Amino acid sequence: MNRRKFLETVVAAGATLAASRVFAGPATSGMRSNFAFKKEDTPVILEVAISGSTTKKVNPAVPETAAELADEAIKCLDAGATIVHAHTNKPSDNVAKAVQAYVDAFTPVRKKHPHAILYPTANFDPAVYHKNRTVWPPEIQSGHYRPLAEAGLANMILLDTGVVPLAVYDKNGMIPQKGFWWYGFWPGDNKIVIDTCKELGCGTSISVFEPGWMKNVVAMARAGTLPRGSKLNIYFADYGFAGMAPPIPEALQLYLHMIEGLDLKWSVGLVAHDIMDTPLARMALERGGSFRVGLEDWGRGPSNLEQMERAKELINKVGRPIVTGAEAIKYLDIPFAATRPKA
């Protein structure tokens, strides 16, 4: 598509939007800041993201091999995790290789915990994305989900709908050339994920890095497009990190206002630091949400199990139960046949 035709498409889309007269409503006193619910009847979804980009060189507690990932996932599930998310850190433009890395890591977990909620990350390579200034096409970046679901291993997959820059500011307050890359998804990625969920019954973990990502979620929720078994992970980062809102109550309140009136399960997460050192973990618990922990988010922190134990202490103080196993699948309404509890 040439530039003129592209601009014509954008203008036409703008005209359609204007004609639809869909606008955000005003803020009200009935927002989720005053959200009332029975704590004992509203379970917490405790997700543990056991690995990310951090290596053993940075933190010896990080699991890296398939055997280590499997062992760590099993330990976290034994300790009461609702969901385990993992990165094998073996991305490949050969989708079969990317799939096999997760098969090796997830198979022992599925055998030990048949009702576990497990999901992989997208198939992406930051070094390649930095070099090429673009992402892999959808059939590569999201092509591993279906084979993992067909194998009965991943009963949840990632539904990411936008673009976010990932970098730490340098001493001049600039995004440095070295290490910068952008994490992003095309409509084709979303179609692959939603089609996989419709056909195989996977739930989705939906990342929200910016308000625009949440607008995508709201649009799909209103249209009835979100798959069953969906939950949101709303991410924050401090002022030293490019992208994402700071971890302050006002930022979370914005997101909660955006989803007001929608029946969505949601959690908060913090990039590169401890979510429990911010007001957001307790705020989420007191408003019916959850929060996630683990070495993907707080890569330099204590072990996954130690982060879990601290999280459980806070959850117990607030007075809400943690949902696990088959009950978690029913609570999230994940229709994935291989792990759906029998009636």
Model-predicted regions and their roles:
Residues R21-A49:
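C-terminal segment of N-terminal export signals and the immediately downstream linker at the start
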Residues I83-Y102, F236:
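Glycine-rich, proline-tolerant flexible connector loops at the mouths of alpha/beta enzymes
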Residues V95-P120, Y255-G261, A311:
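Alpha-helix-loop-beta-strand connector modules within alpha/beta enzyme cores
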Residues K5-P26:
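N-terminal export signals
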Residues G52-E68, F124-P138, W181-Y183, S267-H273:
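Active-site mouth loops of central-metabolism enzymes
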Residues L158-E286, S290-R292:
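Catalytic alpha/beta core domains of metabolic enzymes, predominantly
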Residues A105-F106, R110-G184:
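Active-site beta->alpha loop and helix N-cap motifs at the rims of alpha/beta catalytic domains
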Residues L69, H87, I157, V217, ...:
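Conserved, mostly hydrophobic/aromatic
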